[in-house]
Amino acid sequence: MSILLDSGASIDDILEAIGNQQNKKYKECFLKSTRNIKKGYSIENSFRSSELFSEFFLSMIRCGENSGKLSTVLKDMSEYYERDYRVKSKLKSIMIYPAILFIMMIVAVIFIMYAVIPNFALVFDSNNIKPPFFSYIVITSMLFMREYMNILVPIFILIPVLIYILIKSNTENMDKIDKLKCKLPLWNKYYMMSVTASFSRNMYIMLKSGIPIINSVEIASDIIRNNYIKKQLEISLRYINKGSSISKSIDLASVFPDVLISMLKNGEESGNIEKSFQYINTFFENELDIMTDRIIRLIEPAITIIMGLVIGGLIIAIVMPMFDAITAI
């Protein structure tokens, strides 16, 4: 849209052209927006009627219309969503190799359970071989799971689903989980780094586009998918409304790292809070990339070690009694 606007095309022609290239859902949305624009609606209200776009996106469009910089705003939004897509794609690619290893481990365990364990159990029984305690536990557990697999599998699937439903259906439980995400050792550093990078990026884009600071904080807060952080930012909004500085107000929320507060103070002193959010975003996104790469390097060998321990443990549990029997003979 930004490129086509710069080339001089009208907004309704652009939306119609884009709509004809999208799937049915998006095509209907863009064509409906085109009809509304032709009726005299603003671009924001035309998009809002489709109920497909976020409040963040709609606020940015409104700001672009009012300032006459719609093309610039759309370019910023394009970069924002491209970055968001790259991060999500990277996280998905991270999980492919561990997922493959995990599936291989499950397949190997199932093979041992159905093809190996029953035969060894039969040999032990027919020769009156009493396996060691560890082997006995493994073999008995495997035989039990094999016997009641049709009951155990639905239970193992149902329990997480029920827990998820119970948590989702209760706002208080969701708030506790969201707070735990921010406080849990090891995990909280990565999670808050991600939230801070996202929050600062959203704030920079909105302030750059001319959205007032109070509205920017409100919209940036709504985008965050964490009820605990949203409630803490309500404290910040109250203090901003009272006239407190942005750095002091966000500091009172007690959720963001000290680095963010310090950089905001510097931005207030220099009179360029917008640039401060840009620097904060750059800093935390770089830190996030470094930490993500470290996690990738740790996950792959960790999964391999776990797989080796599980498969190796099963093999030892099966083979050990056989060696004991041969030694006894």
Task: Set out the residue ranges of the language-model regions.
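Catalytic metal-binding core of the metallo-beta-lactamase
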Residues: 1-100, 178, 182-301
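Exposed alpha-helical structural elements
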Residues: 56, 133, 140, 172-176, ...
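Bilayer-spanning, highly hydrophobic alpha-helical transmembrane segments
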Residues: 86-166, 286-329
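Juxtamembrane helix-loop transition segments at the membrane interface in multi-pass membrane proteins
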Residues: 126-129, 162-184
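Alpha-helical membrane-embedding segments
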Residues: 151-172, 208-223
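Short flexible/disordered coil segments
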Residues: 169-172, 222, 254-255, 285, ...
